[in-house]
C-alpha cells in the first residue's frame, strides 16, 4: 500500500495540481483530518505517512531524513499525479524530508511544480529543543508543551510502548539533520520555493526560516501567518491559500 494517503480531491482531476503534505515529527494522517473538508478546484491533497504509525504501525521505523525522502520519491513516481504538477508542503521535520526529496528529484532530472518549507529552521541551524537523549517522561512532557501530543498520553504510560518508537525515530531523524557548511550557488535548489513562518511559533522563528534562502535559489516569498507551531493543522484553509499563491506564481 502506498504511503501517500489522499485527504481530498476535486471532482475534476485532469491535470490537477497535487499538494503533498509532509508531516512534522510524530505526525500522521489523523493530524490533518480537517484538511479533508476543504473545497478544492482541480486539486488533490495527499499526506505522506511515515513508518511506524497507523496502517504502517508494523513497518520498521526510520531515523534518517534521506531514507524518508527516498520513500516519498518512490510514492510520487507510482501515484497517478504527475511530478511536474506536484507541490510538496513540508512542515517542521517534514520540511527536511520535502527539501531532500526535491533535491533528489532534481538530481534525477525531475522538477516539482514547487516546494513549501514551513515552520523549520534552515539545515545549518540546530533546533533549540533537542529531545533525543531525554528519558521517556521528559520526552512526553516536552511534546505536550510543544503542542504535538495529546496531554492524556503523559498520564497513560501503558500506551508509551505503542507510540514512543515512531515518535523517538522521528526526533532522532530531525535532530541528526544538521549541516556544518553552506551550499554554493550552484548547489541551491532550483525550483520555486515558498517559506512560511508562524508569528507565534517558538520552535522556529522568522530569521531561522529565512536562512533557507541560502539553500534554495528560487524563493518567491516568505509569508508570516498567524499561529504557533501547529498552524498547519489548526488552519487548513489559510494554508491552502498559501499553497495556491505559490501554485499561481509558478503557473504565471
UniProtKB/Swiss-Prot annotation:
Q: Name one GO molecular function term.
A: hydrolase activity
Is Metal-binding among this UniProt entry's keywords?
Answer: no
A family per Pfam = Thioesterase
Indicate yes or no for the key word Hydrolase: yes
**Enzyme Commission number, as recorded:** 3.1.2.-
Give the metabolic or biological pathway: Siderophore biosynthesis; anguibactin biosynthesis
State the top-level EC class. hydrolase
Keywords of the record, alphabetical order, are: Hydrolase, Plasmid, Virulence
What InterPro entries does the annotation carry?
A: AB_hydrolase_fold, TEII, Thioesterase
Membrane-spanning segments = none
Question: In a knockout, what does one observe?
Answer: Deletion results in a decrease of anguibactin production and in a moderate attenuation of virulence.
- What biological-process terms (Gene Ontology) are attached? lipid biosynthetic process
Q: Where is the active site?
A: 92, 229
Q: What does this protein do?
A: Probable thioesterase. Involved in anguibactin production, but is not essential for virulence or iron transport gene expression.
Family from the record: Belongs to the thioesterase family.
Indicate what this protein is called per its UniProt record: Probable anguibactin biosynthesis thioesterase AngT
Amino acid at each position: 500500500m502506498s504511503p501517500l494517503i489522499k485527504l481530498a480531491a476535486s471532482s475534476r482531476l485532469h491535470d490537477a495540481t497535487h499538494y503533498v503534505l509532509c508531516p512534522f515529527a510524530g505526525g500522521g494522517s489523523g493530524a490533518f483530518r480537517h484538511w479533508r473538508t476543504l473545497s478544492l478546484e482541480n486539486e488533490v491533497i495527499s499526506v505522506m505517512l511515515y513508518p511506524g504509525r497507523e496502517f504502517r504501525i508494523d513497518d520498521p521505523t526510520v531515523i534518517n531524513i534521506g531514507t524518508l525522502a527516498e520513500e516519498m520519491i518512490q510514492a510520487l513516481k507510482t501515484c497517478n499525479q504527475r511530478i511536474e504538477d506536484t507541490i510538496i508542503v513540508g512542515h517542521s521535520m517534514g520540511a527536511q524530508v520535502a527539501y531532500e526529496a526535491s533535491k533528489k528529484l532534481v538530481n534525477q532530472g525531475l522538477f516539482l511544480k514547487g516546494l513549501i518549507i514551513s515552520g523549520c529552521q534552515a539545515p545549518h541551524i540546530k533546533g533549540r529543543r533537542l529531545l533525543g537523549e531525554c528519558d521517556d517522561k521528559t520526552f512526553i512532557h516536552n511534546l505536550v508543551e510543544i503542542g504535538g501530543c495529546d496531554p492524556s498520553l503523559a498520564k497513560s504510560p501503558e500506551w508509551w510502548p505503542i507510540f514512543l518508537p515512531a515518535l523517538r525515530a522521528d526526533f532522532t531523524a530531525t535532530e541528526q539533520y544538521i549541516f556544518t557548511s553552506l551550499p554554493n550557488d550552484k548547489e541551491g535548489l532550483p525550483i520555486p520555493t515558498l517559506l512560511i513562518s508562524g508569528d507565534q511559533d517558538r520552535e522556529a522563528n522568522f530569521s531561522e526560516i529565512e536562512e533557507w534562502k541560502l539553500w534554495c535559489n528560487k524563493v518567491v516569498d516568505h509569508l508570516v501567518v498567524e499561529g504557533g507551531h501547529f498552524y498547519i493543522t489548526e488552519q487548513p484553509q489559510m494554508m491552502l491559500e498559501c499553497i495556491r499563491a505559490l501554485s499561481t506564481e509558478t503557473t504565471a
